[in-house]
Amino acid sequence: PSSAASDVYKRQPFSIPHDAANPCGFTINNEKHQLSIATDIGHMTNDIVKHLEGSELLLLESNYDTEVLKCCKYPFHLKARIAGSTGHLSNTMSGKTISYLLKNSNLNTAILGHLSKESNFPELAYQTVVDELLANNCNTDSINLSVASRELPGRLIKL
């Protein structure tokens, strides 16, 4: 991936581990602000984290709950693909990533996105991430955490 500049904004794509052709996430920044979008992530890598560091706002995949995935109606091969290293990011891993960024970066807003309809629920994704934040001694009052709607546009966020 290569970067591109538009006016004062720079868009920097970064590679992600997913079973698709050239998948990528994006970091968008200017001199004052940075945001990142990262979905369809099979597993979190140091390279992805480096791209996310410095972001004030992050839209991060929180695709599935491990226990719900085990019990959902998906066939075994699809469950294995989703939970595999080139599949999707679990709620727990999303929470661990947000915890790290909250402690080591400028993150103040995180939106959980790309939730599965079959193996996740918005309330469960949210609570799992909050539980991870608390387990990692993060101040939950220092982050604006929300879950993106599957069907509707989100609210306007001003940086």
For the regions a protein language model found, what residue spans apply to each?
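Active-site metal-binding loops of divalent metal-dependent hydrolases
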Residues: 16-19, 39-41, 62-64, 115
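Conserved beta-strand hairpin/beta-sheet module of binuclear metal-dependent hydrolase folds
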Residues: 22-39, 57
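A short acidic, often aromatic-flanked loop/helix-cap motif at beta-alpha or helix-coil junctions
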Residues: 6, 19-20, 151-156
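Structured catalytic core of nucleotide-sugar glycosyltransferases
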Residues: 11-13
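Single conserved hydrophobic/aromatic residue that forms the stacking wall/gate
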Residues: 1-9
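Cap/insert and terminal regions of metallo-dependent hydrolase folds
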Residues: 46-147
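Short, basic/aromatic-enriched C-terminal tail that caps enzymatic domains
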Residues: 143-159
